[in-house]
């Protein structure tokens, strides 16, 4: 009975979180502005993994994840970033299913590590799959609005993901993985800058609105 209650509570939490994600995406599409706050990276990853696992199990895909220890917080709309991660993990699972990989080679890996880009500290999120990879012509057009590798759907998923990342002053990219000439999968990654320290934020505000001086 206790196990059943725990399972029901988990299901209720997942349903509530899914509802929050849908509402935030609607708000973002209308305003194109994220609700950025100090966000804990491991918590975001945990929430995204919990929701994505449902879809990955449906495709018989194993999900593993690694989060580096003691990651600083990022300034982010956690619900939107969770949705980016969920989309990338689900896309990976669908690519694996399309490639008809054997059960021993059906995995998606999420890794979150610190990374510096052009001298700026940040956090890199990467989702790697063992799917069929992306043809070059698809890579070139991947983030165009309405372009899709799927036979159905509007193709807004990756375009929306990139818009969300870029609205956080981040960047997103995709690359195929190879074993010799053979494509063994694909890796999507995006980078977010760290939250500025409190003093830096105060300095920025002060510089944006300098005090008036009497002439």
Regions found by a protein language model. Give the residues of each.
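Core catalytic ATP-binding domain of two-component histidine kinases
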Residues: 1-206, 211-215
């Amino acid at each position: 009975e206790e196990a059943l209650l725990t399972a029901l509570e988990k299901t209720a939490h997942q349903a509530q979180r899914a509802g929050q994600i849908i509402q935030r995406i609607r708000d973002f599409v209308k305003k194109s502005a994220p609700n950025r706050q100090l966000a804990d990276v491991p918590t975001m990853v945990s929430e995204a993994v919990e929701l994505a696992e449902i879809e990955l199990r449906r495709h018989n895909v194993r999900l593993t994840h690694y989060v580096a220890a003691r990651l600083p917080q990022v300034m982010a709309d956690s619900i939107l970033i969770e949705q980016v991660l969920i989309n990338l993990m689900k896309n990976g699972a669908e690519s694996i299913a399309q490639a008809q990989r054997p059960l021993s080679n059906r995995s998606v890996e999420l890794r979150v590590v610190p990374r510096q880009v052009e001298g700026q500290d940040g956090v890199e999120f990467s989702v790697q799959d063992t799917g069929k990879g992306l043809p070059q012509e698809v890579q070139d057009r991947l983030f165009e609005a309405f372009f899709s590798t799927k036979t159905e759907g509007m193709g807004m998923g990756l375009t929306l993901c990139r818009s969300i990342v870029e609205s956080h002053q981040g960047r997103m990219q995709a690359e195929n993985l190879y074993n010799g000439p053979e494509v063994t999968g694909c890796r999507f990654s995006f980078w977010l800058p760290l939250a500025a320290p409190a003093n830096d934020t105060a300095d920025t505000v002060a510089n944006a609105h300098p005090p008036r001086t009497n002439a």
